[in-house]
Every structure is written in structure tokens, then in C-alpha cells.
Curated annotation (Swiss-Prot):
One of the components of the core complex of photosystem II (PSII). PSII is a light-driven water:plastoquinone oxidoreductase that uses light energy to abstract electrons from H(2)O, generating O(2) and a proton gradient subsequently used for ATP formation. It consists of a core antenna complex that captures photons, and an electron transfer chain that converts photonic excitation into a charge separation. This is Photosystem II reaction center protein J. It comes from the Eukaryota. One of its GO terms (cellular component) is photosystem II reaction center. InterPro entries: PSII_PsbJ, PSII_PsbJ_sf.
Length: 39
């Protein structure tokens, strides 16, 4: 296990989870807007 300094593990998980949710929401929004424009 590598010690990344004084950054707590919950903060890393929170930032990672927020990034995943943002990417997924952008993908869903892009596919939804693309589907609407194609129709």
C-alpha cells in the first residue's frame, strides 16, 4: 500500500465517485440529446 501523504481515503473515494458520476451523467446526457436530435 502506497501512502499518498495526508490525503484521507474517504476524500479520494469521494472525488473518484464524483468523477465517475459526472462522466456517466455526461454520457447519458450526450446519448439522450443525440437521440433526440436524430429523431
Amino acid at each position: 500500500m502506497v501512502n499518498t501523504g495526508r490525503v484521507p481515503l474517504w476524500l479520494v473515494g469521494l472525488v473518484g465517485g464524483f468523477a465517475v458520476i459526472t462522466i456517466v451523467s455526461l454520457f447519458i446526457y450526450g446519448s439522450y440529446s443525440g437521440l433526440g436530435s436524430s429523431l
